Amino acid sequence: MLHEPHASSTQETQLLYGHCAEVLGTDGLWLNVRGPDGYEGWMHDGYTAPSELDKFIKWAWDIESEISMGCSVRDSRGATLDLPLGAVIGDGHVIAGRALDMAHRRATFPPTADAIVASTTALFQGTYYQWGGITPWGADCSGMLQSIFALHGIHLLRDAWQQATQGAAVDCSLEDARPADLLFFSDREDGHITHVAMAIGGSQAVHIALGRGGHCLESFSQPDDYTRALAGRFRFARRIVA
């Protein structure tokens, strides 16, 4: 999903294979769409296929059928598709990698703090920073956390400043935050939230950051120059998982 209806526009977020969106308007072959999280942007018609209204699913992560954990599928036409974490398998047949239906996703990825921390540190390890990305193929800070929490059955909004309105306020320092608490940062004078990380315990956090090139673990008890600067921008924490 792009900011404006042309190919050189900035990517705002992503809609994955099999996910639904509402069409708000058109500009030639470009569609102005609203995703399941309320985010709006532009997509070219070539990336879309019509869907019956009664089949519209607000959150594709909640469907009963299989979702990719990172796999390759062969579709009904015999074409091979590589699908990232979160894409819907649909009528495809998995030929490599893994896909899980709802029952197996809920059993494998429960909505608990320890499980969420494990997924965030493992599934996005090695991911590079990509503005607007939401998958291990490239993600930004809030995109990674939105996808991870969705995998565990918890819906977060898209941007860091929006996620900062969710859950419960927590009065704690960076060192005292509990595993899976969201940590919010700002580099603006008005305090507007511009970055989010997740506490993993032991005075550590995991995030995707441009300054690190992507996925990274930070230690606030043994900081380097980057981590000290990051800590200076800390504003508050929110607890999503009780």
PLM feature segments, named:
Residues 50, 58, 170-172, 194, ...:
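Aromatic- and glycine-rich peptidoglycan recognition patches
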Residues 128-179:
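Catalytic cysteine-centered active-site loop
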Residues 1-2, 57-72, 150-164, 200:
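Short, basic/aromatic beta-hairpin or loop at an interaction surface
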Residues 6, 13, 17-22, 27-29, ...:
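Boundary regions of SH3-family modules and the immediately adjacent low-complexity/disordered segments
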Residues 2-4, 74, 186:
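Core beta-strand residues in small-molecule sensory/regulatory alpha/beta domains
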Residues 176-190:
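A structural-propensity feature for long, helix-poor, extended segments
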Residues 128, 134, 186-195, 209-216:
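Active-site loop architecture of trypsin-fold serine endopeptidases
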